[in-house]
Amino acid sequence: MPVEKTLLILKPDAVARGLVGEIISRFEKAGLKIVALKMVKASPEEIERFYPSSEEWLRSAGQKLLKAYQELGIDPRAKIGTDDPVEVGRIIKRSLVKYMTSGPIVVMVLKGNRAVEIVRKLVGPTSPHSAPPGTIRGDYSIDSPDLAAEEGRVVFNLVHASDSPSEAEREIRFWFREEEVLE
């Protein structure tokens, strides 16, 4: 089904930098419709439950960071004490909880033709250093994996976007009751 819904979260750095309106306008200009939106101060428990703890998710998150470190010539053992993708994923998840609870976030549901795919394209790659100009992370991110490693934290990359239609469904149900999502 080409018309679908997806979840987008504007992370604390996007909110703190006053980029909410600018980022939202990108999606509206791309033909996506906002069907739910709220600003929340998430608790550590909510973020802990929101991001998966499966070995598959931890490994995937860890591999993304290890790839970024490799591209930047960073030794993961020296910076974070391990090069095991699952353990790196655990470190990322702990840092994500701290980051995502450091300030308010804006959570929204976008609807449109191939919404998941379009949002992912507009957002750009997870790591800002490899996000091309024209993407949200490429145009607005001011962080990088090497700076984040130096400061012992996760990369501030402005937004979270669902990876797949099935993930979007789970994530939308997590943040919104059915009656909060308009058609």
Curated annotation (Swiss-Prot):
The keyword Kinase applies. Pfam families: NDK (PF00334). GO terms for biological process: nucleotide metabolic process. ATP binds at K11, R120, T126, R137, N157. Its cofactor is Mg(2+). It is found in: Cytoplasm. GO terms for cellular component: cytoplasm. CDD domains: NDPk_I. It catalyses: a 2'-deoxyribonucleoside 5'-diphosphate + ATP = a 2'-deoxyribonucleoside 5'-triphosphate + ADP; a ribonucleoside 5'-diphosphate + ATP = a ribonucleoside 5'-triphosphate + ADP. It is an enzyme of class 2 (transferase). The keyword Lipid metabolism does not apply. Residues 56-88 are annotated as: Insert. Keywords: ATP-binding, Cytoplasm, Kinase, Magnesium, Metal-binding, Nucleotide metabolism, Nucleotide-binding, Phosphoprotein, Transferase. The active site is at H160 (pros-phosphohistidine intermediate). GO terms for molecular function: ATP binding; metal ion binding; nucleoside diphosphate kinase activity. SUPFAM superfamilies: Nucleoside diphosphate kinase, NDK (SSF54919). Its EC number is 2.7.4.6. Major role in the synthesis of nucleoside triphosphates other than ATP. The ATP gamma phosphate is transferred to the NDP beta phosphate via a ping-pong mechanism, using a phosphorylated active-site intermediate. PANTHER family: NUCLEOSIDE DIPHOSPHATE KINASE. Belongs to the NDK family. This is Nucleoside diphosphate kinase. It comes from Pyrobaculum aerophilum (strain ATCC 51768 / DSM 7523 / JCM 9630 / CIP 104966 / NBRC 100827 / IM2). The gene is ndk.
